[in-house]
A protein has these predicted regions:
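A short beta-strand-loop structural module common to alpha/beta enzyme folds
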Residues: 24-32
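A generic short alpha-helical patch detector that favors 3-5-residue windows
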Residues: 21-22, 148
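N-terminal beta1-alpha1 ligand-phosphate binding loop
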Residues: 1-21
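Anionic-ligand binding patches
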Residues: 2-4, 37-191
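Short loop/helix-cap segments at secondary-structure boundaries that form the rim of catalytic
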Residues: 14-18, 35-36, 57-58
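Surface-exposed, flexible loop/turn segments at secondary-structure boundaries
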Residues: 11, 31-33, 112
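Residue-level detector of anion-binding/catalytic polar loops
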Residues: 22-24, 185
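Cofactor-binding loop segments of dinucleotide-utilizing enzymes, especially the Rossmann-like FAD-
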Residues: 8, 28, 109
């Protein structure tokens, strides 16, 4: 049995490594476009399911796939296209609540388990100069919502409810429970 992470995200690799599991990375080549007319909660789950199905090849393999979005005032905020888009996104988040949603799919053979984890975040008021300085670090450019909570944006979030690691792109608590339900050991412990 292979444990496969269907993601090229270095943060997801790092977080899965915290669980003491040996895994291989197999990147899903799918269209991740979400339908803006559908509920983001359901859409992020659908994309994670598509990723898992795209890399599943051999019987017995366990595939982990995730997709993360940020939703603020009903708008889905993906990765910024450029620095101007990053500025627009971070300005929108300034002084507001938003939700980070991660669709998580674990697949083994015909069994497909999908959850959507939601973490609520509040950003304090941000100064335009600090937004520009943060963008200049390059950190926001490959992240949904144009920020990394584990990096410089830790200075922006003054409130959070839910799984911190979900904001980084992999809800590890939910994942551990799901993997154990399939009989996998985490840190040598089986459920």
């Amino acid at each position: 049995m292979n444990l496969i992470l269907a993601s090229q995200s270095p943060r997801r690799r790092e977080l899965l490594g915290l669980m003491g599991l040996d895994f291989i990375v197999r990147v899903a080549d799918i269209d991740e476009t979400m339908d803006p007319g559908l509920d983001p909660f359901d859409e992020v789950a659908r994309v994670s399911r598509m990723k898992a199905l795209a890399v599943s090849r051999e019987k017995g393999d366990v595939v982990i796939a995730a997709d993360t979005i940020v939703v603020c005032e009903g708008k889905v905020l993906g990765k910024p296209r450029d620095e101007a888009d990053a500025f627009r996104i971070l300005s929108l988040l300034s002084g507001r609540d938003h939700e980070v949603m991660t669709g998580l799919t674990v697949l083994r053979d015909e069994e497909v388990i999908t959850h959507t984890e939601v973490t609520k975040i509040h950003f304090r008021e941000l100064y335009p100069e600090e937004i520009r300085a943060y963008i200049a670090t390059g950190e926001p450019m490959d992240k949904a919502g144009a920020y990394g909570i584990q990096g410089g944006a830790a200075l922006f979030a003054d409130g959070m409810a839910g799984d911190y690691y979900n904001v980084m792109g992999l809800p590890v608590c939910r994942l551990a429970v799901t993997l154990r339900s399939l009989g996998l050991e985490i840190w040598g412990v089986r459920a």
